[in-house]
Structures are given as structure tokens and as C-alpha cells.
Amino acid sequence: MQDKIVIHGARAHNLKNIDVEIPRDKLVVVTGLSGSGKSSLAFDTLYAEGQRRYVESLSAYARQFLGNMEKPDVDSIDGLSPAISIDQKTTSKNPRSTVGTVTEINDYLRLLYARVGTPYCVNGHGAITASSVEQIVDQVLELPERQRLQILAPVIRKKKGQHKTVFDKIQKDGYVRVRVDGEIYDVTEVPDLSKSKQHDIEVVVDRIVIKEGVRSRLFDSVEAALRIAEGYVVIDTMDGKELLFSEHYACPVCGFTVPELEPRLFSFNAPFGSCPDCDGLGVKLEVDLDLVVPDSSMTLREGALVPWNPISSNYYPQMLEQAMTSFGIDMDKPFEELSEEEKQLIFFGSDGREFHFHYENEFGGVRDIDIPFEGVVTNINRRYHETNSDYTRTQMRTYMNELSCVACHGYRLSPQALSVRVGGEAGLHIGEISDLSIADHLLQLDKLSLTDNEATIARPILKEIHDRLTFLNNVGLNYLTLSRSAGTLSGGESQRIRLATQIGSNLSGVLYILDEPSIGLHQRDNDRLIASLKKMRDLGNTLIVVEHDEDTMREADWLIDVGPGAGVFGGEIVAAGTPAQVAKNKKSITGQYLSGKREIPVPLERRVGNGRFIEITGAAENNLQNITARFPLGKFIAVTGVSGSGKSTLVNSILKKTLAQRLNRNSDKPGKFKTISGVDYIDRLIDIDQSPIGRTPRSNPATYTGVFDDIRDLFAQTNEAKIRGYKKGRFSFNVKGGRCEACSGDGIIKIEMHFLPDVYVPCEVCHGRRYNSETLEVHYKEKNISQILDMTVNDAVDFFKHIPKINRKLQTIKDVGLGYVTLGQPATTLSGGEAQRMKLASELHKRSTGKSLYILDEPTTGLHTEDISRLLKVLDRFVDDGNTVLVIEHNLDVIKTADHIIDLGPEGGVGGGTIIATGTPEEVAANEASYTGHYLKGKLK
């Protein structure tokens, strides 16, 4: 086999016909500026071709189900292995996907509980066991010889009634005696039973003495008793002791039954085991009373019931006032002072009691009717489930929240599944063990109390679970729980989960391609991640990692720097070699940062802010330990801490959602906290994340930033446009008029191919220019509208230098380092980092109030150190204008430039959730308890 992968003539996206050699069975890091072509080389060339060759090897019949992959634009690739991509874009948003299902640990847990689990009565009557006739007989024969026994069939247990038909059937079946409520009677002489009392009725099947040769008779009698009592038998030893047996998993005291233990019983994705109330989701969509009455100090007349406020109709306000008058409820009393009975009536209705409703609409229509009062909660639920209107359903949804299912307490499983425990009655059920952190889960497995027989059965299952948990622990995910919904994971977390799964597969000879696995990982955990990558390499695999993390680059066997710039200024191999060789390459920007010739400087002084702050007290959502956090305003704030320490919970779930409620009227419910102060010092909340700026190719930088509106205005003002009567809309490719109708303004036509990938070809009518020929005849400075869209931002800045309104917006795009992007580049082709910087550019050209709060969650994702340097300059501009910038970040180059740090920890999960250190980077670095401070020391020298 070849010792290297050889690529000739790669031209995907901005790659400039490059040739590159990649050593096999090595840890190879591909780096470079955002937009330089790293992903084009790793994913769109290497992975795409590896996948395509595999799919091509299958039959045409199989290919129609798998889909066909487009051949990447490359001349040849030699030495290619089967490729597996582990990126951040394939996180499951299915609410049924959890960490346990994605890693397949749940499959082994289900098997463990099915094989060595013991069900326990939910009513506290102890273990529930199932016994065969043979097992019952063997156990009875262990009693002392000459022991006298009664074999009873319990046909009625704790049921009210006279039960005459039961006695008739017993007599008809040929049995002579019965035991009723502990007393033996002849079946024909049973006294009349009280209808209102509970009774126990047992058929006396046989009376025997334990002695040699009795086994056959005992077997027949036990079998008969089980048949009569539908699986139950009582062995009365005649000296006050009774033995209860069942051939089913059923409690002999209360009758609680459990089906035969099998893996599907413990699956919340199967009807057999899922909670019947929430269908295995663990949550139910319920009306949230806090959203219905957000301010309980208001009266009903003042509008305490938000859903029934008179926005478009007076129907509900009129009905409310007349109903309250009828039922004697004061409309002018603060809602919080109403009695519980009054609140229940307002929320859930009058329980059939009617009131007279006289309604007059704005058109003069009158309605007189006696009706029960429905209640606002009942009304919202009914309208949400019965309406055919998307608008109404959306409106009703704003007053609802996903609340933990009351029936299963959020565990997703049926009572029968949750009754099964491993390790005795003190052990945990499968829901409880799934709620443990990975680290605690490992400890729990190590101290399981099993019998010798159970240990033998469980050993291979426990090994698989233990190995997978250890892999998760080793990639820095020790704080996660198996019950954590996959949709709530960050891109970095989901990628490391799949990485752990691949390590567990022990494959060799595979080409793994990873996209920034260090995202969201604290420096403390980076060493463990790198060790995991090296372990995969040592199994005989080739790892190609797109990465900007300095530690990962230094630990690589081979480093490829793509550049020198981004977009049209990138797409070349600037340097390739060992990290030491790249560090010596003067052309490589990456090399200059590795060698220390370039660096992001530590600020000479820290900002003092404006003296005001936002303070949150009693923050207790997820793992937060009832903390108080102060965010000083007018500063650059970094919230830091190990993965899972509570950073996102504090900033995103509590601070951001609370401010969004107060400032933007958002209905998302914040996490748990007691009070928040200082909100009045903020007038705008701007969340700048890395989500796409548009979900269709029609969205582009020009449309997103609003500069395209100005450009279309400019074209509409040209003499040619005025002569032809063209308005601004003529120059839009989204509406009929000026666009090419052959391609609907897309510029390309999709041709569907049978058994081959769809082919996209330039439109034959407009030749990819999006507009019809008449529109393209209008020029501004010898350029038509299509040629403007093909310009890079750098070129457009010069072209429109005398049009301040346009130039200012374009300059902000250039300032954030996106000068290489074309104005018409489809938004779907922008990376997450590029999309985030485009949002920053859009904010930059808006007029600043000096009272804005910008929140960025890990803004360095996908960014090279050079990109981070530019990003920091932009963020500094926001703060210098008097605004506040708050980032959640692990990157030490960003943290060291902050004015104020809030460090959470000390660990992740239940071991975190407290504030370890606050202050300037220098103050945090001096704090011995802070992991962040420990790593920060080296950056502040």
C-alpha cells in the first residue's frame, strides 16, 4: 500500500488547481485563514471522492437508495482509503435522540436491565419474581420433612362485593373448601359477604405433608392452583407462614404487573416501553401560567391575562368581564391577590356553570347566549389543537412551554420499565442511571452489587458500556449525561461524541476527516483529546484534522497551511511539513504565529467601564449552584470555564433570554433565577451567532447587509432606467420583471440525472447572470447589475467610493476581514465564521446608542489566529463606543484581551456551576483555584 495520499489538480471552490501529498497513517492538521480553502480540500475533495468511490462500487439498485455523490473537481487522487467524516453539521435535532442513543450505550444498558434487572413493586411491596412450576415445587420441597401444607389458589384479592358467582364456579369445578378472609369454609356454607368491604377468596386446592414421593402430587396441585388463579399460588405452612408465588412478573399483594423483561421494554422509542403519557419524549407541551400572567401585580382590567388582551378583537375581553361579574370576581384586584379558587376558575373554567354572554362586534353584530366559562388555559389548549391556521397555532404556542412529563418525571419510560433495578432494591432504574454524568456513571458501574450468576451474565455487557463511557470521558465529555438531548449539544460536543464512537469501533486503515474537534473544549481537556486522536492514528488510520488550535498543530505529525489569504486570495498550499518546518516558513502566517513572530498583543490597559452593571442573583438552572453574577457594562467581558461548567446556562439560558423578554418581547422562558437588576442600562440586545445568514442561495452578503437595496436605488436613478421607466424592483432577482424567467433569477438550472448526481448548469438564456437582457442594458459606470454582484467587496469599496451610503456598508464588510467575498456569493456557501462576521459587519454600520449588549457564543469557532486578531479589533470598536461585549470563550488569545473575566467551575456537570474567579485577566491568573487562570498565566507574560 502507498505511504501517502497524492492529490493532483484540486479545484473545488477556490482551490487553484493544487497538488498536495499527505502522509498516510499520520495525524495531519490542515490550517489556514477562514475561507482559505481548508474545508474545500479536506471535505469537498478528499472526503467527497472517498465516499463517491465507495458508492460507485455498489450496484445501480443500491445506489438509488443511497443517492449519488457529485465527483469533486480534481484530476486524480491516489492512495485514498475509505473515508469517514466527523464534522459539526450533522447534529441530530430529533427530540428522540440522546447522548445514549447516539453512542449506542443505551442499547447495552437496555440489554443489561433485561438480563440482570429485577422488577420491584411500585407500591412498595418488594421484589417481583416470576417462577415456573418446577421452581415453585423445588422451593416448597426445601421445607422440613413432615411439614403440613395447604395449597391455595387466590382467585379474589382485596375486591369489594359478595362474589356469589365466584363461589358457584368453585363448586362447579369440583373444589370443596375455600378460605375467605383468612377463615376456612365449606364452599356450600360460606356466609354472605358484605358488599362494601374488600375480601380475599382462595380455593383450597390440596392439603399435603412434605415427605418422600410427594413431588408428583405437589407438582399437579401447584399447576392446578396456578391455572385457577391465573398465575398465582399461595403455600400456607399451617403455622402462620405463607409463601406467595407467581409465574408472571406480578406483585402478589397489589397485582402490579411487569411484562417479560426484554430490551425493547427499556426503549423510549418503542411503544412497548415508552411512557404512554408523553410517548417517550419526557416532556409535554403545556400552557405555562407564567406566560399567561407574566405580571401578577396587574389586575384583570389592566390586562393581566396577556392572551386575552384586546389586540384585534374585543370578543375575549367582553367575555372575561361579563363572566367575572357573573361569578363575583373583582376585575380591579391585582391578580396575585385573587384566591386560589378564583384563579382556578379563570385558568380552567367554571366546570359547567353558565353565565349570560352579550357580545357586540365592531360591525354591529349582536350575540346573546348562556354558556359555561371556558377558562384561558383550556381555551389556549383547544385553539392550539383544533385550529387549521398556522398563525393561530403560532400565537397559542407563545403561551406554551415544554414541561417535564408528570407521569414519568421526564424519564421517558413506562412505570413497568422504571420498576426494574440492577443491583438490588437500592440500585438505580435505567432512567436514574441515564441521568448520571459520564464520570458518575463510571463510578456507579464499578460498585454494582451483583450475585455470582448475574455478574457472569453482565460481565461482557458491562465491558462494552464501560469502554464507551471511558472514550467519552477521554474526549472531555465527562460532564454530559446519557439522557441529554442530542439537539442541545454544541457542534464540538456532538463531534467529540461521534469521535468517541469511532474510537470504540477499533477500525484501522480508515481515512478520518475531522472539523475542529477542539471547539468548546477548555485547554485543560485538550491534552486528552489529542491523546484520543493519536490513539486512532496508532490503530493504523489516517487523520486529517481541520484545526486552528495551537496545541493540536504542534502535536501533529504533518501540517498543511492553506492560503495565503481567503476566498479568491487563498486556495494555494503555502506550507507543508512538520510543525517545526512550517514555523520556519516566512510565507506562512500560521508559521509566524507558531514561531512567535506574530502574536495577538495583551492590551496595555484594561477598560474601567461606565460603573454600571447587570446583576443576576439566585441563578439555579441546570447545574448552577444558586449563584450571583455581576456583568460590568461598558467592558469586554469573557465568561470562561471548563466544558459543562454552566457558561451557556448562565449567559444564554438566563441572561440572554431574560433580556430578550424585557427588550424584545420574546416569549422564550429564561432559566431559574431570583432577581435581575440593571436591565434599564441596556436598550438593545444583539445575539451574534454562527448560524447561516440565509437558508437559500438567493440570500447573499449584498441582500443581508442591506447594501443591495441602495445599489438597486442607484441603478433606478440612472438616466437609462428613468427613460425606460424602470423602478427599484426591476433590479431584483427575486421578483418577476427584471429577472430571467427561464431560471427564476437563480442563474443556474438543475438537471436531474437517473443514477447519477444532479447536474447544475448555467442558464442558457441569461448565461448565469440572473437577469433578462433588457435589465442588463442598464449600466452604472459601465457595469450592469450582474457584474456588480460578481465583484468582491474589496473591488466594490473602490467602485462605490463616491457613494457614501453604499461605501460605508461595504467598508464594514471589509473591516471584518471579508473583502474577498463577492457581493452575490450565496449565503449557503459561507462558513459559520464568515456568517458571524457578516452579522458583525451589519451591526457596525448601524448607528450606535452606546447602550447595546452584544453576546457571542464561542466566536472564534472556525477562525485562524489572524482572523481572531481582526475580530477583536471589531469587538473593540463596539466597546469603545460605550457598548458592552460579552463572549463565552475558551480561546486564550481572546480571554487575555478581555477587560473582565467571569470564570465558572471548578468542574463540569454537577461538579461545576459556581463562580471560581472574577476580575481582570491578571487577577484571574493569580487565582490558584482557577483552571483558566492556570493556563492564562503563560499568555500574559
Language model region names:
Residues M1-K941:
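Conserved phosphate-binding elements of NTP-dependent enzyme cores
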